[in-house]
Regions:
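Short, acidic/turn-prone active-site loops that include or flank metal/cofactor-
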Residues: 82-85, 108-110
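A conditional alpha-helix N-cap/helix-loop micro-motif detector
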Residues: 34, 84, 138-141
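Substrate-binding clefts and catalytic carboxylate motifs of secreted carbohydrate-active enzymes
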Residues: 95-257
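Active-site mouth of glycoside hydrolases
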Residues: 1-75, 81, 88, 99
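Conserved protein kinase catalytic core
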Residues: 62-63, 87, 113, 170
């Protein structure tokens, strides 16, 4: 079945690389996983000699990389999914493991929801998470790309995929990763990525929320652990500006965290 898929798509002009498994090591501990991935990569090389192979890791764990070097020599490019606090360490981990082939960052973005515990002010007493503002995320995306991806081209980094280029439909917090809202309007992170890729911002910029003090409920910020009573009246306030001077329309949504 896999070979049939390769034969079907190997000459498609949109095909760049064959990715064998996405974060497979997160679900399996048996080292035979890498033998299986290598067997698939070998089959792909025999069936389609014109496209490289990769496998995608959930982190740049040195031991996992060493296992791939030893057991999966038919992997041409290593792909890593990683987020704000861990991205700077990827290149060092690759070098420590002895990886000498190219690599890609196949997911990057702000601090993940599972990475908030080191920042206690971002975790509320009942376990809820304090999301970054769209402007804070914009800064994180731009910094991540400029300081850890673009600068490492000569160190084997082929490029990256920003997460998530679209409307987010999964995760604990509905607006955590998506760079677009449900209607297709952009968040500032889209501006950041266009600037990172082209050196110019888009002509029509996304609205800006300057500081955390510009998003309040009953005069408090989210990290103030706001508690409200059932059937009570509460006031939410957001202060936003548009870099282009466009008029803004405000849509309020109340969403349950998963």
């Amino acid at each position: 079945e896999m070979k049939a898929t390769v034969e079907r798509f190997k000459d498609h002009p949109a095909l760049l690389v064959w990715s064998i498994g996405n974060e497979a090591e997160a679900s399996y501990t048996n080292l035979k996983l890498w033998d299986a991935i290598n067997d698939i990569a070998k089959m792909i090389h025999e069936t389609d000699p014109n496209h490289p192979t990769t496998t995608t890791l959930a982190s740049s764990n040195v031991n996992h990389i060493k296992n791939i070097i030893e057991k999966a020599p038919h992997i041409d490019i290593l792909s890593v999914n990683t987020y704000a606090p861990n991205l700077p360490g990827v290149l060092g981990n690759l070098q420590s493991a002895g990886w000498t082939k190219p690599y890609m960052i196949t997911e990057f973005g702000p601090r993940g929801t599972w990475q908030m515990n080191p920042e206690p002010e971002r975790v509320l007493p009942w376990g809820g998470l304090v999301e970054q503002t769209s402007s804070e995320k914009e800064a994180d995306y731009l910094k991540a790309y400029q300081e850890n991806i673009a600068v490492n081209k000569d160190n084997g980094c082929l490029g990256s995929f920003v997460f998530l280029w679209g409307y987010q439909t999964h995760g604990e917090v509905l607006t955590w990763y998506g760079l677009f809202d449900k209607k297709g309007y952009t968040f500032p992170a889209v501006d950041a990525m266009q600037y990172a890729w082209t050196g110019s911002y888009p002509k029509n910029r996304a609205p800006v929320i300057a500081t955390r003090n510009d998003i309040l409920m009953n005069g408090k910020k989210a990290e103030d652990a706001i508690i409200v009573s059932p059937n009570s009246s509460n006031e939410a306030k957001v202060t936003a500006t548009d870099p282009d001077g466009d008029a803004l329309t405000y849509d309020w949504m109340i969403m349950k965290e998963k």
